[in-house]
Amino acid sequence: MTRNCSLKAIVLLVVLIGGALPALAQQDRYDERDETVAPEALAQFRKGERLAKNDRLDDAIAAFQQAITLQPDYAQAYHQMGLAYAGGNRYPEAVKAFKEAARLQPQSGQVQENLGVAYIKLAQWREARDTFAEAIRLHPDNAEVHYNLGLANGKLNRDQEARTQFAEAIRLDPAMAKAHKNLGLAYLNLGMLDQARKSLQEAVRLDPKDPQTHYALCVYYARAGDTQAANREFQAVKGLDPKLAAQLTDLMRAGAPAKKP
């Protein structure tokens, strides 16, 4: 596993995606004292909440839409409707609902966060970056949002900015393994190999069952000429994710550029 091929080309297979894509932040239970809501609209909103909780998403969307019809400035209903759309993987509709919620409730960092996640699901990275930046302006101490902004920057090949955001996420939440992993991957892309190794080793310590972290460490050790360590990490990848190990083998053998996920 020590074939001398492009480090950045190999790393691109996993860089700055962090395993599963981000999840949406579920809204806290709505308190009708927060805004003046017509009783009929509130009843439809509550109905939508119950339906969504039971995974009856289409019916929930209809109830939230009815609440909005009764009260067009109902920001919470737009937000919950966006969550219901997202729950059904209907992200274009979710974006529209979250944008309307953000227009009506511009100081809600949670709405901005969920809008950004919906953009990530649609691979609209510039929109995601701008939205997460606004979410951070509203709530600068949210580690998850800093992490998500790092992902968006990474996908835009803004590795320095990505590194900054992952480091901030770690400052706020030192146990966030995925932030350590992606910080390591950003360091790899920047050619900062010693820092990459330290970040990836910390990610493995926090989450030893993440195959992507072992993959990145395998690449690092192969590049450094440490055959024993590279093979150890390769065996870890193989045990956790045989398909990923096969991809790594093919890439190392061919020395060919990897396609971004």
Predicted features and spans:
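Bacterial N-terminal signal peptides
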Residues: 10-20
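N-terminal leader/linker segments that initiate helical-solenoid repeat arrays
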Residues: 21-58, 62-65
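Terminal, low-structured helical/coil segments at or just beyond the last alpha-helical repeat
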Residues: 26-37, 215-261
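Helix-start (N-cap) detector for alpha-helical repeat units in TPR-like alpha-solenoids
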Residues: 34, 41, 75-76, 109-110, ...
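Canonical tetratricopeptide repeat
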Residues: 46, 80, 114, 121, ...
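Structural signature of tandem alpha-helical TPR/SEL1-like repeats
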Residues: 53-66, 87-100, 110, 121-134, ...
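Structural marker of alpha-solenoid helical repeat scaffolds
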Residues: 70, 104, 138, 172, ...
